[in-house]
From Swiss-Prot:
Stretch forming the signal peptide: none
Coiled coil: none
Alphabetical keyword list: Phosphoprotein
Name this protein carries in UniProt: Thiosulfate sulfurtransferase/rhodanese-like domain-containing protein 2
Domain Rhodanese: 300-395
SUPFAM superfamilies: Rhodanese/Cell cycle control phosphatase (SSF52821)
Name of the gene this protein is made from: Tstd2
Species this protein is from: Mus musculus (Mouse)
Upper classification of the organism: Eukaryota, Metazoa, Chordata, Craniata, Vertebrata
Residue stretches spanning the membrane: none
Enzyme active site: C354 (cysteine persulfide intermediate)
Modification Phosphoserine occurs at: S268
Length: 495
């Protein structure tokens, strides 16, 4: 079972937070400005450090400000981390203590902007100086210049998806070359705070990968800004944003960071590029391929593999009929899985799929680079887009998502079972042992009997802790996870 507290998991997307997911921003390869930032600067840039830090702090505080009804409060107020602040001292203290990392990120970005602006001003000709900055987005432009006007929207409309009221969760990615991911990081942080969005966003020189939740008004504004941004407008379309019912309550907070990869496969983008993926198939084309495959004889079916690129706990509760679903815990294990099982792909047509399409981009590129497959295809838009078009198609079960919802249901089929009694069941809960907190499938009847852990060891451990003195919770890998083969050896191509 995947741990909810492991900082190295990626897929990826939180009182019961799944910190193993795609967009988890606390893993060790996060590139962040640190307290040593000033010491690393050259002499001329170091002089601007204090100004940049103050401005970064002020900009972040400004994004937290919310209008106050005149009949209720005359001064300014700020909202952050589901708290309301009525005076500057308290919001300043909160930002300084709880969002220091964001301040450092934006400070580093502002320093780059100041340096670039100074360099540009010294080299511009009079003709250059007359050029409009709106023609092209450059690092010298302030983050605040790319925040949408929300004066026509009430604070209630922006925050309506935070409680029981229905909001929306967006899932998207965009592979494109970004020269200054730190600028994009600062901008995305400010943009999401501005629109009261929560979620997780990964940024790298190879692009951006995000999932954000908020009110429908806020998510629509977010899409509009992304589609109008010069960095992404030539690559993104409205169809690239997958939406589902939810809101900002689906995530405990906002996490935005700069990484080497926008989805961690564990291989540098310079070695395996998103620019050489498998052939994209629309949901309709993918549906026809599977329909044709399932109508063939067993011998003919052996020439094609439907490959699930997700983790085992995702495919466990939902998958395409006849697929090969690797029993791996992380996408970063996928390259090793391919290497270990290369023979099953030899001279085969491979139809790959994942949640939204992002893992297939580089996953298919890696498989193609091996040079053993006859053809490699991938589902454009992933399962998400397929289910929008074919809710009762060849995908059976639920779609796992990396937030507090755990899964989305598009059809009534149940393909998984209770870990204890074997009854049909597909509703994940977290292991009841605090140190473990892995995902477990245990039906209502078994939960009523006290079976709430991922395995017998955890069940016993949880019982002893409940009867003993309280102690601080600390992360601990479960024995059932430790016993799992890291990279399974497949005996046959089809399941």
């Amino acid at each position: 079972m995947p741990s909810s507290t492991s900082p190295d998991e990626e897929d990826g997307l939180e009182t019961c937070v799944l910190k193993v997911f795609d967009l988890d921003l606390k893993e060790s390869n996060l590139v962040n400005p640190s307290n040593s930032l000033k010491a690393e600067l050259d002499g001329s840039t170091k002089k601007k450090y204090s100004f940049a830090k103050k401005k970064a702090f002020a900009l972040l505080v400004k994004t937290k400000q919310v209008p106050a009804p005149s009949y209720e409060f005359k001064g300014k107020r700020w909202r952050c981390c589901q708290q309301l602040f009525a005076d500057q001292i308290s919001i300043h203290r909160h930002v300084a203590t709880q969002h220091a990392e964001d301040v450092y990120q934006q400070t580093a970005s502002l320093l780059k902007q100041l340096t670039a602006a100074l360099s540009a001003s010294q080299s511009l000709t009079p003709t250059d100086k007359r050029s409009s900055p709106k023609d092209c987005l450059t690092p010298s432009q302030e983050v605040s210049a790319w925040l949408p006007d929300v004066s026509h929207v009430s604070p209630q409309e922006l925050r309506s998806g935070q409680g029981d009221e229905e909001g929306e969760v967006l899932l998207y990615y965009c592979y494109c070359d970004l020269e200054d991911p730190h600028w994009v990081c600062a901008w995305q942080t400010a943009l999401c705070h501005h629109l009261h969005l929560t979620g997780k966003i990964r940024i790298a020189t190879e692009g951006i990968n995000g999932t954000v939740g908020g009110s429908k008004v806020a998510t629509r504004l977010y899409v509009e800004v992304m589609l109008s941004c010069p960095l992404f407008k030539d690559y993104l379309s409205e169809d690239d944003f997958k939406s589902s019912k939810g809101g900002s309550h689906c995530f405990p907070e906002l996490r935005v960071g700069v990484f080497e990869e926008i989805v961690p496969m564990g291989i540098s983008p310079s070695q395996v590029s998103y620019k050489k993926p498998g052939i994209h198939l629309s949901p309709g084309e993918f549906h026809k391929e599977i329909e044709k495959l399932l109508s063939q004889s067993s011998e003919e079916q052996g020439n094609t593999i439907i490959l699930d690129c997700r983790n085992f706990y995702e495919s466990k509760i939902g998958r395409f009929q006849g697929c090969l679903a690797p029993d791996i815990r992380k996408f970063s294990y996928f390259p090793s899985y391919v290497d270990k099982n290369l023979d099953i792909f030899r001279q085969k047509r491979v139809l790959m799929y994942c949640t939204g399409g992002i893992r297939c981009e580089r996953g298919s590129a890696y498989l193609r680079a091996k040079g053993v497959c006859k053809e490699v295809f991938q589902l454009k838009g992933g399962i998400h887009k397929y289910l929008e078009e074919f809710p009762d198609g060849f995908y059976k079960g639920k779609l796992f998502v990396f937030d507090e919802r755990f899964a989305l249901a598009y059809n009534s089929s149940v393909v998984s079972e209770c870990s204890y009694c074997g009854a049909p069941w597909d509703q994940y809960k977290l292991c009841s042992t605090p140190q473990c907190r892995q995902l477990v499938l245990t039906c209502s009847a078994c939960q009523g009997q006290g079976f709430t852990a991922c395995c017998v060891t955890c069940q016993d451990k949880g019982g002893k802790q409940a009867s003993g003195p309280s102690q601080d919770s600390f992360k601990e890998e479960c024995e059932c996870t430790a016993r799992r083969p890291r990279i399974p050896q497949e005996q046959q191509a089809q399941s």
